[in-house]
Amino acid sequence: MPLLDSFTVDHTRMEAPAVRVAKTMNTPHGDTITVFDLRFCVPNKEVMPEKGIHTLEHLFAGFMRDHLNGNGVEIIDISPMGCRTGFYMSLIGQPDEQRVADAWKAAMQDVLKVKAQNQIPELNVYQCGTYEMHSLEEAQEIARHIIERGVGVNSNDALALPKEKLQELHL
C-alpha cells in the first residue's frame, strides 16, 4: 500500500490550531488544486467530540466558502479527519496560509452566531446520514477554542519525518 502524504509528517510535533499545505497538484487543464490540513486539535492529545465535529462539518463548509472563495480560489470540499483532530480542505487555487487562517477565524465567529440547532444546514433525514448526531453547543465550544488560541502555520519542512524513521515505522 502506498504511503499517503498525510502520514509523512510527524504528528508529535504538529501544532494546533494551525494551517498546513498538505498537497498541491495540477490538473491536466492547468488548474492548481491545493489541499489544506486545518488542524483544530493537537494530535494524540486532543480530539473533537463526534457530535460537535459533525455539526461543525455542516456549518464550516458554508462559512469558509463565504470568507475564502473569490480572487482565484474556489473550495471543492471540506471534510473532517477520521482522527477527529481537524479537517481537510481541497480547493482550486493557491491562497497563502494567512488568507486561509483569516477565513477560518472568521468562519468560527460565524459558528458562534448560530442561535439554534434548527439553523444548522441540511439537518434532516434526507440530507444527512446521521441527522440526530449533532450538537450546536459542542460546535460552538470548538469555535471558541480556535478563536481563543488563534491559528498558526505548520510547515511541511519542519514536520517531515526523516526517511530512516519512515522505513523503521513501515518494516
Curated annotation (Swiss-Prot):
Cofactor binding: number and manner: Binds 1 Fe cation per subunit.
InterPro entries per record: LuxS_sf (IPR037005), Metalloenz_LuxS/M16 (IPR011249), S-ribosylhomocysteinase (IPR003815)
GO BP terms in the entry: quorum sensing
Keyword line: Autoinducer synthesis, Iron, Lyase, Metal-binding, Quorum sensing
Alphabetized PANTHER family for the sequence: S-RIBOSYLHOMOCYSTEINE LYASE
Function: Involved in the synthesis of autoinducer 2 (AI-2) which is secreted by bacteria and is used to communicate both the cell density and the metabolic potential of the environment. The regulation of gene expression in response to changes in cell density is called quorum sensing. Catalyzes the transformation of S-ribosylhomocysteine (RHC) to homocysteine (HC) and 4,5-dihydroxy-2,3-pentadione (DPD).
Protein name: S-ribosylhomocysteine lyase
